[in-house]
């Protein structure tokens, strides 16, 4: 077997030399304010000497330039104040955002590497990976500043190179990265640092294949135990599986990630769309989808409701509304239209329960809200052709609450009683 990429901890000499040259190039700027103007001038000083002719070297040179500037911009704030990215000053934050945008644009272009790529080109790539890894696990800055670059260099540049190789060689390379990451366990108890370390390992294990999914997911769940964990920081597991059209494995990951994603509402719409793609290709996975969506409750309530309506599960939708104490006033008429058209009688308890809830406030605002729902309820009884039943109800309702003058006024305004 052959190690396709020299996975090592030390940064390659050529990459070190680039960074040394960067420092010399921007020295005339001194310790200026780390804003967009500073980074623009610094990049101009570095690039004015020209770029390497070799397209692979040029891409890696530019990437290292942006990464170096990212380090320079972020480090002073975090070294002096021990703060994270969220605490950066406004202008510094803009500079970081611009650099990260440039990095993303660079990764969007393929790195022209093949199985016959020269040793020198591989060393540039390996050295750049080492640099990113070191910065990601550095105790002097927010690890997630460089975590995204770590993921992108694997997804966009290294993994495409591995696709030209035999399976055993790919596994050997990924194993080497896992082993190195394990050796680099952060000594600091800093939460973001540990999370980056766990998630980096999780991602490499994920790329090794389905047989490592349990290991990968266990690392995610470990990271998710931290209070400051954000699901948005997770690598693109779901997108990767979608690109591979691996629907069975995608269904498994969607199910297993539900407990993690329920911690935050972000990206749940995307999560629901992934399920739609799975069910389109793999209809037998529908029971898994319902299990996963139930795990997302209560945070994923809206997603769950939408799915119940789109799949025509009217009774389950209504049971959920009643148990959750939801209010029909919070829904647009168009949102309830599928139920009105297919099972309108099921909406009756939903409206009646909400009316009583608003009545319990015992103030004019509550009465107004109740009357608004009663007007919609009247239309619903008319739709199901049970107007006599409605007339009996509203008459008894008004009589039962005859002493509530404010309510009586609202009922008359709503033309519900004479």
Which role does the model predict for each range below?
Residues 2-418:
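Eukaryote-biased, non-catalytic alpha-solenoid scaffold regions
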């Amino acid at each position: 077997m052959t190690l396709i990429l020299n996975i090592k901890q030390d940064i390659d000499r050529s990459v070190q030399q680039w960074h040394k040259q960067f420092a010399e190039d921007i020295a005339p700027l001194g310790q200026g304010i780390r804003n967009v103007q500073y980074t623009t001038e610094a990049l101009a000083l570095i690039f004015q000497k020209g770029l390497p002719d070799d397209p692979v070297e040029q891409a890696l040179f530019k990437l290292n330039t942006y990464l170096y500037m990212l380090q320079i911009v972020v480090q002073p704030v975090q070294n002096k104040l021990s703060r994270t990215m969220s605490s950066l000053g406004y202008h510094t934050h803009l500079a970081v955002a611009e650099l990260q945008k440039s990095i993303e644009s660079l990764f969007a272009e393929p790195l022209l590497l093949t199985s016959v790529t020269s040793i020198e080109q591989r060393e540039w790539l390996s050295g750049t990976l080492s640099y990113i890894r070191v910065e990601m696990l550095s105790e002097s800055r927010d690890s997630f500043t460089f975590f995204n670059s770590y993921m992108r260099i694997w997804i966009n540049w290294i993994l495409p190179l591995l696709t030209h190789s035999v399976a055993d060689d790919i596994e050997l390379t990924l194993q080497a990265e896992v082993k190195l990451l394990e050796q680099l366990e952060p000594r600091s108890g800093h939460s973001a640092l540990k999370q980056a370390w766990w998630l980096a390992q999780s991602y490499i294990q994920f790329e090794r294949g389905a047989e490592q999914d349990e290991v990968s997911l266990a690392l995610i769940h470990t990271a998710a135990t931290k209070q400051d964990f954000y699901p948005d920081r997770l690598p693109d597991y779901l997108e990767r599986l979608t690109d591979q059209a691996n629907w069975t494995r995608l269904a498994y990951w969607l199910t297993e990630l539900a407990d993690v994603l329920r911690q935050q509402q972000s990206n749940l719409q995307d999560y629901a769309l992934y399920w739609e793609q799975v069910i389109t290709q793999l209809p037998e996975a529908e029971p898994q989808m319902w299990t996963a969506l139930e795990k997302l409750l209560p945070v994923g309530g809206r997603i769950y409701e939408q799915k119940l309506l789109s799949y025509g599960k009217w009774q389950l939708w209504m049971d959920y509304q009643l148990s959750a104490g939801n209010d029909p006033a919070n829904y647009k008429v168009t949102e309830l239209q599928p139920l009105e058209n297919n099972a309108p009688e099921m909406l009756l308890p939903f409206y009646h329960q909400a009316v009583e809830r608003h009545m319990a406030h015992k103030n004019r605002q509550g009465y107004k809200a109740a009357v608004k729902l009663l007007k919609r309820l009247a239309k619903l009884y008319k739709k199901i052709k049970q107007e006599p039943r409605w007339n009996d109800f509203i008459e008894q309702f008004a009589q039962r609450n005859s002493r509530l003058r404010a309510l009586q006024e609202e009922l008359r305004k709503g033309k519900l009683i004479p």
